[in-house]
Amino acid sequence: YTLNYSFTTAQEIMQGLLAGKVDHAVLGEPFLSIALRKDSTLQILADLNRPDSVSSGFAQTAILYAPAIKKSQKAIDSLLHLSCRFAVEQPEQAIRILEKEKIFASGMLTPESIERCKIDYRTASEAQENILRFLQLIGQYEPKALGGKMPDEKFYK
């Protein structure tokens, strides 16, 4: 079994699956849900986003603050936490808002796709261990991506 990186975007991977050019793939949302809707024979073999006793998951997205709004960080963190809880607790309404605001095209998201995302907002200090583990993984394969060193404690504040 060899790895094939000739498909470089999630959309290309999804199209490769649907065209039968790809047998196995790691595919994130919303492309996973779109592929499952278009081809009912596709199956999820593993959920890489399921924290368990062995792995607590890893940070997938970072929110960066411009220095000018750093003073509002607590309020922004609170709003982001509430927004994420809203998406988890009321996925249909969240989908309507995301579609209305043209963040996602109509039909791209489903309540199942939101559930599979395991949305859980944490501040950098709350997620420090997971962030560090993720950065160490990146550092193993591409140290230049980290500027050759791990961030110091100020990074998590």
Please give the residue ranges for each predicted region.
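Short hairpin/turn module used for nucleic-acid contact or packing/dimerization
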Residues: 4, 24-26, 153-157
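Short beta-strand-to-loop elements that line the ligand-binding cleft
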Residues: 2-9
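Secondary-structure end/capping motifs
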Residues: 71-141
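Residue-level "edge-of-site" marker
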Residues: 30, 48, 111, 127, ...
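Pocket-lining segment of extracytoplasmic ligand-binding domains
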Residues: 11-98
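Conserved C-terminal helix/tail region of periplasmic/extracytoplasmic solute-binding proteins
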Residues: 132, 136-157
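Secondary-structure boundary/capping positions in well-ordered alpha/beta enzyme cores
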Residues: 42, 105-107, 145
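Surface-exposed patches in mature extracellular/periplasmic domains of secreted proteins
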Residues: 5, 87, 94-98, 146-151
